[in-house]
């Protein structure tokens, strides 16, 4: 509409807007390590983002890290059916149809017909997109652990996974996440989340408790976020981290991240009044526009 009216248009990338909204709420214009974790948003490279580490300020951003890319198969259905993401990650890890078929059957992820369709779409690259969505990882783990294989509303599977983790914490207390070193890929660091999902699937098949595994997933992902911020600090010299995106509505993950980052000397910005999900993006966009307008006046 603005273009049709001949008005200037300022385009702000989705995950960058999340970080700007957190910066605006906390009244800072200093550069930050932005941790933008959510369900879905278009990246600048044509893939789906959602588990991003950004070096960000009001002048722009650089993508310096992410969760491990996976193939999101099935279009919009994959956002509702976490088993699709689970199968995709397991298939990517094994690169073997028969092995993946046995695991998917044992985990009761889907029926044989749907599984064959997943293989076909993946192998022929039909209705697929590369994704780094942290939200979809929650859906995949929820499916693997038998908590929720599908969602009837946004965030159902991931919320159920959080509740399971909280129950596991109450019953058994907190554990310590094992070390999974970061690696380099296409000029950025990558959290080894594929290995994490694979390990959880193996342990579930050995009969380990789903609630305890849900807790360990939260701990491991928080540890990965902390390691990512430490790596970003080494690269950028920044010690301020801004946590935003719908995944940080998960209070358990947020708690683990806040505790770990503050113990390591980070100044952590988080949301208090503005929602971390897409409900807060408009603030980030407006703050960016105000910054640009003020610069033009100077």
Predicted segments, located by residue:
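Glycine-rich beta-strand-to-loop/alpha-helix junction loops that act as flexible
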Residues: 39, 134, 241-248
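A contiguous, well-structured pocket-lining segment that forms one wall/lid of small-molecule binding clefts
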Residues: 88-239, 252-258
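Conserved phosphate-binding/catalytic loops in two-lobed NTP-binding clefts
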Residues: 6-18, 239-244, 251, 257-281
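Flexible glycine/proline-rich, aromatic-decorated loop/lid segments
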Residues: 42-43, 47-67, 107-112, 117, ...
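Short glycine-aspartate micro-motif
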Residues: 32-36, 131, 242
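Conserved phosphate-binding catalytic cores of ATP/NTP-utilizing and phosphoryl-transfer enzymes
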Residues: 11-34
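Short beta-alpha connecting loops at secondary-structure transitions
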Residues: 62-76, 101-104, 122-126, 266-272
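Acidic, glycine/GT-rich loop-and beta-edge segments that sit at the periphery of enzyme/chaperone cores
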Residues: 98-106, 286-298
């Amino acid at each position: 509409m603005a273009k049709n009216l001949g008005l200037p248009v300022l385009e702000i990338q989705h995950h960058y807007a999340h970080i700007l909204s957190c910066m605006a709420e906390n009244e800072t214009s200093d550069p930050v390590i932005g941790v933008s974790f959510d369900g879905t948003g278009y990246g600048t490279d044509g893939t789906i983002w959602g588990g991003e580490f950004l070096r960000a300020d009001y002048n722009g951003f650089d993508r310096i890290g992410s969760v491990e890319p996976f193939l999101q198969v099935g279009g919009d259905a994959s956002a509702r059916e976490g088993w699709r993401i689970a199968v995709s990650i397991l298939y990517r890890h094994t690169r073997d149809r028969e092995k993946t078929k046995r695991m998917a059957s044992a985990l009761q992820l889907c029926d044989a017909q749907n599984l064959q369709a997943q293989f076909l779409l993946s192998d022929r690259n039909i209705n697929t997109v590369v994704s780094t969505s942290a939200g979809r990882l929650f859906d995949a783990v929820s499916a693997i652990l038998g908590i929720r294989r599908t969602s009837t509303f946004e965030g159902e599977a991931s919320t159920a996974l959080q509740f399971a983790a909280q129950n596991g914490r109450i019953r058994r207390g907190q554990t310590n996440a094992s070390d999974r070193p970061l690696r380099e890929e296409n000029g950025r660091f990558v959290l080894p989340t594929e290995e994490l999902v694979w390990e959880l699937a193996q342990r579930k098949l050995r009969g380990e408790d789903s609630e305890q595994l849900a807790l360990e997933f939260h701990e491991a992902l928080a540890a990965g976020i902390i390691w990512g911020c430490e790596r970003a600090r080494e690269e950028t010299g920044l010690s301020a981290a801004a946590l935003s995106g719908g995944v940080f509505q998960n209070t358990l993950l947020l708690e683990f991240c806040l505790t770990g980052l503050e113990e390591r000397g980070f100044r952590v910005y988080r949301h208090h009044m503005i929602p971390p999900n897409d409900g807060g993006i408009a603030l980030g966009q407006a703050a960016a526009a105000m910054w640009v307008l003020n610069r033009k006046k100077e």
